[in-house]
A protein has these predicted regions:
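Gly/Ser/Thr/Pro-rich low-complexity, intrinsically disordered segments
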Residues: 1-404
Length: 404
């Protein structure tokens, strides 16, 4: 491992190593799974390295989760996947005393069961029978509480409902300057509690998941301030219904009907067809940080898309922050590059920036692509910045491709 005293020292060392166009090649990794690598030109003489995995039947995809977060290559080593990429947004803070029970932000469905109920409208990547699709998921639906049907809605929406969901996407992350690292992500501890209740109509109820997939009410607060991070699901509901031990079952989330057909889902976005990314609601989503997520700056980008011929693709456009020659791609450049590859049926951005990583099995060995500049920040035991090109940032969700 190579250690540095400062990020600028690391940048000077890494530039001649990493700022190089990749040699173009195309490799069949397994039946139905192909990896293509190429350096693509950008304006001003810059370039971006493109790594695209394309798959068709009989290959299958799976959405997977990790708690605690681990790196993409570590996840791949523990699985039989041919390709592993990082997935969707997750709770990420450099300084926090507590964290949510489910790290994947907003919507998370795991093994056909709800892990996190969305509190805001957001696109989702959904896995049905080994195939991925992009679905617009408004945060509302139907549930049963104490054997009675109710309409629910996310607490960050304006949807009319009988009860309102709170969850990990109510958290607030602030980006603040840091003399050592440049910036730090600070979790605002007060944001893990529900808002105050000032009338006798509502109560907040905390639920825990049970093995059969339903939720059981384990706590109640009539004045609000219920700790969302200590529960799998929190609902603000009519006080007459708020009783410990009550059974809750979620039936629908937007257009998604819960059942065995939906194996997994994670919040992602925005979709590649969104008309004006500068006005997308994710820019104001404080669970992702106080810096606008979709600012038009170059960065490493990871996207999923499906072309009209039925093929599915994962594309990582790689760069190194601060490089003039190898800066990564802007949002507009990413969309244009994807559209240049053929008629697009659907697509979305995944968690991009420093998180994006692809791990590939080739000839029995594991190779990784993307974000090879990644530095592990100083900790209590080590004050150095440690270069971890193969590992990268740990993540809480992954897309895994299997040959059948």
């Amino acid at each position: 491992m190579v250690r540095f005293h400062t990020p600028s020292e690391a940048a000077a060392y890494l530039a001649p190593i990493l700022d190089r166009p990749v040699e173009p090649c195309e490799t069949e990794l397994a039946p139905g799974i192909v990896l293509q690598m190429a350096a693509l030109p950008l304006s001003g003489g810059a370039f971006v390295n493109s790594y695209t995995v394309t798959w068709r039947h009989p290959a299958r995809a799976a959405l997977c989760f990790a708690d605690p977060p681990i790196s993409a290559p570590d996840f791949a080593r523990g699985s039989e996947s041919v390709v592993t990429t990082t997935g969707g947004f997750f709770f990420l803070a450099d300084y926090c005393r507590h964290r949510p029970r489910t790290l994947s932000l907003n919507l998370a469905i795991r093994d056909c069961r709800v892990s996190s109920l969305p509190v805001s409208d957001q696109d989702a990547l959904v896995n049905r029978d080994g195939a991925l699709s992009v679905v617009a998921v408004p945060a509302h639906g139907e549930l049963t509480l104490g054997q009675r049907p109710f309409r629910w809605a996310g607490s960050r929406t304006q949807h009319d409902a009988d009860c309102y969901a709170y969850g990990n996407a109510n958290s607030v992350i602030l980006h603040q300057p840091d003399a050592r690292t440049g910036k730090a992500r600070i979790f605002q501890e007060s944001s893990r509690f529900t808002s105050e209740i000032t009338c006798s109509r509502w109560s907040d109820v905390g639920f825990m998941a049970r093995p059969d997939g339903h939720f059981a009410a384990v706590s109640r607060q009539d004045r609000g301030q219920l700790d969302m991070f200590r529960h799998d699901l929190v609902l603000r509901c009519p006080r007459a219904l708020a009783r410990e031990g009550a059974r809750l079952e979620v039936h629908t989330i937007g257009p998604l009907s819960l059942g065995r057909s939906i194996e997994a889902a994670i919040s992602v976005g925005p979709c590649l067809s969104y008309p004006d990314l500068s006005r997308h609601p994710l820019n104001d989503d404080r669970s992702l940080g106080s810096f606008p997520l979709l600012a038009e700056r170059p960065a490493t980008r990871l996207v999923f898309y499906r072309t009209t011929d039925g093929a599915q693709h994962l594309c990582l456009l790689d760069g190194r922050p601060g490089s003039d020659a190898f800066p990564g791609a802007t949002l507009a450049e990413t969309v244009a590059l994807v559209h240049s590859r053929g008629p697009l049926a659907a697509g979305c951005f995944l968690d991009s920036g420093h998180t994006s990583k692809i791990a590939v099995r080739r000839d029995g060995a594991l190779a990784t692509y993307g974000n090879r500049h990644y530095l592990q920040w100083p900790g209590e035991a080590d004050s150095s910045f440690v270069w971890t090109p193969d590992q990268g940032r740990p993540s809480a969700s992954f897309i895994a491709l299997h040959s059948r």
